[in-house]
Structure formats: C-alpha cells, structure tokens
C-alpha cells in the first residue's frame, strides 16, 4: 500500500491532529517527519478526553498503530520523556513508539541561544517559540549536531558535546553575556535521560520501507504548515524545516514514488501565530468572533492566534507546491451564525490585481485582499455526518472553496470530536 502525506496548507494550527486521528485506525504506521516541540496537535477522543501532543505522533492514541519519530525531527529529550509520562499517566500504551536513530537531539545550548537571540532581536524578532528548534537545525546543516544514535556510545557523545560547547559557550559568554554550560553536566543529564528512550531507537527508514513492501499503510504527519516552510513559506517568518510534502520523503527515508496521496488540511478560515504577513487578518469584531468561537490559542505556546477570512490564494499555492490530491476542511462549524462569509480570491499589490502568491516578501507584506462575499448560514451543523446534512449555503461554501483551492474536499470537520467529521471521499481508497 502506498504512503499518505498529511500536511497543513496554511500557517499551521489547521487541525492536523484530528485528521491523523481519523485515519489512524486504518493505517499501520504514523510517522512524524519534521519539526520539534514547537508545534502541537490536539486530539479529542469520543469519550471527550483531550490530548495535546507536541513531539509524539497522533497515532499513539490508536491501538495497533506503530508510531515513528522520523529522522527529520529534532527531539528534545526532556520534552519527549515528559510527554510520554503524561500519556502513560492517563493510561495510554506508549510501547508502540519508535525513534529514528538519525533524528537530531535538541540540546540545552540550543534553547539558551534561541531565547537570547530572539530577545536581542527586539522589534525585528521572527516570533520563534524559543524552544531551540532553529539552532538545532543549524547544527544539523553545519554537520556538528548530535543524533539520537550517539547516546549509544558514551565516548562519541562526550566528544561531540565538548566540541559543540567549545564554540557555543563563546557565543553565550562573549556575545550575549550569559553563563557557560558545563560539558560534563550536559553529558550526565543526557545520559540519564537516554535511559528512558534508548530502547525505542530504531532503523526507521528500513522498517518503514519494509512495511510498504508488506502492503502496510504508512501515514506521514507533518507539523506546522505550508506557509511556514523554510523554502516555500513567508520567509523569514517561517520554521527551520520543510513541512511541505517534499519534506515527508526526506524526513522519513521513504522514496517519493511511494507517496500517492497528499491530504492537505485547511481551516475554513485562516489563522497565524507569531510575526509575518497575513493579508486577510481581521482586527474587528469578526476577528474576535473567530478567535473566541474557534478557541484560537496555540497548543504549544499558549499564544493567541491571529485570525482572518479564508485565503484562496494561499490555498491554491499550497495545492501546487505540495501536489495536494485531497483536502480536509476543518472548523466549518465556527462559521455558523455569520450573515455573510467573505473569501479572499485575490490581492491587490500597489493597485494591481494579483491572483497568485506574490513572488517577493515585500509584495506579500503589501498585499490587500480582494473579497468575494458568500452567504452565511445560521444552523448548528455540529451534528451533521453526511454532506447532504449541511445547510445549502454551507455546502455552497465548501464547494466554492474546493473550486478556488483546486483539490477535492474529501473530509469536513464540524466540531472538535473524533466523530464530528463528514467524509465525502475515502482518501485511503481513493488511489
């Protein structure tokens, strides 16, 4: 069976956890392929239990699914162990979690540098979560990072930590006037933490390819969203990895020809956390309504999300750069009780109409939305389970978004619960 990629098609927080949870019972493997604990997935079970996950794949809540933290992820050992304990304390079986030997470890000096650099940036800050994600990826690209497998060889680990701190301490002490970190202390803490996850280390790329050869279904789960991709997002206000579909193959070790379905997650409106351009952002009572009704607070950071109307320009862009075959539209229920629902169908930049994503950062920052007004609906749709159960105006809204985005809306979320989903097309059987 081929692999399926699940990605955010906006600026993250689209509801990927709900989509993964929906498909989790029908796949054998769920893989997180990039990012770190700078993003969160929320899963609400039929019992009403709410789980917020940051590093661990959403499939951990589905019995019989093997979950993998892939080589493209940066892993904070302390966060990993805390998250595991939190799940186990609530009765979740975590024995089905594996960690790629090639994933990079997020170290204390990454967090220290991330926080101090962002603080010094002042008004020019990017809006990082301060979790050390960027500095960890910097070390990975510079080939001086520490990988998960390094904890299996204490001598190698000690040498790598000492070499890293020889430079990192110079930065912390001489540039930012911060206290130096002791190599022996960092090593001791990491070795102690490693006792809690060493048994999970695996050759993930081998296991995943063998699974596909055995006709098992593999779901590749991205964090953040397309517009936060370091290459294809609104740079420099982006993350340090590739949440887009191309990153799924690199971050898991699966060949790209194995992937036949790319499921994009779209919120029925748009949100963003942190700094950066946001053409449809609202500063009026409508923005406040979306934030309150949609519960728009970041799972990981606790920061309030910026809210705006649906942006079809970025949806079309996401469809193209990811090769999206299907969409999961979430939070349609939040739009109930609005008289009209504006949809951004294009921009004006310096008075000129633009229907596609502007090429430059400065043009995106100056983009003004061009809206198409769609009629709203007043009915409560949280109980709808078939597309025909939706009011006609809600159906028209979905079909118009589908037309503008350029890919079929296969699933629709009408509430936070696992069962509050309309399935128009089975994405696992579609190809």
From Swiss-Prot:
Coiled coil: none
UniProt: IMP binding residues: 13-16, 38-41, 129, 143, 224, 239, 303
Cofactor(s) listed: Mg(2+)
S-S pairs: none
GO biological process: 'de novo' AMP biosynthetic process; IMP metabolic process
Pathway(s): Purine metabolism; AMP biosynthesis via de novo pathway; AMP from IMP: step 1/2
Family annotation (InterPro entries): Adenylosuccin_syn_GTP-bd, Adenylosuccin_syn_Lys_AS, Adenylosuccinate_synth_dom1, Adenylosuccinate_synth_dom2, Adenylosuccinate_synth_dom3, Adenylosuccinate_synthetase, P-loop_NTPase
Record text on cofactor binding: Binds 1 Mg(2+) ion per subunit.
GO cellular component: cytoplasm
Major subcellular location class: cytoplasm
Residues binding Mg(2+), per UniProt: 13, 40
EC number(s) on file: 6.3.4.4
Location(s) in or outside the cell: Cytoplasm
Alphabetic keyword roster: Cytoplasm, GTP-binding, Isopeptide bond, Ligase, Magnesium, Metal-binding, Nucleotide-binding, Purine biosynthesis, Ubl conjugation
Presence of keyword Zinc-finger: no
Binding residues annotated for GTP, in chain numbering: 12-18, 40-42, 305, 331-333, 413-415
Pfam families (UniProt xref): Adenylsucc_synt (PF00709)
Enzyme class: ligase
Active site per database record: 13 (proton acceptor), 41 (proton donor)
GO MF, one example: magnesium ion binding
Chain positions of cross-link Isoglutamyl lysine isopeptide (Lys-Gln) (interchain with Q-Cter in protein Pup): 292
Reaction(s) this enzyme catalyzes, per UniProt: IMP + L-aspartate + GTP = N(6)-(1,2-dicarboxyethyl)-AMP + GDP + phosphate + 2 H(+)
Chain's role: Plays an important role in the de novo pathway of purine nucleotide biosynthesis. Catalyzes the first committed step in the biosynthesis of AMP from IMP.
Assembly with partners or alone: Homodimer.
Similarity remark: Belongs to the adenylosuccinate synthetase family.
UniProt protein name: Adenylosuccinate synthetase
Species this chain originates from: Mycolicibacterium smegmatis (strain ATCC 700084 / mc(2)155) (Mycobacterium smegmatis)
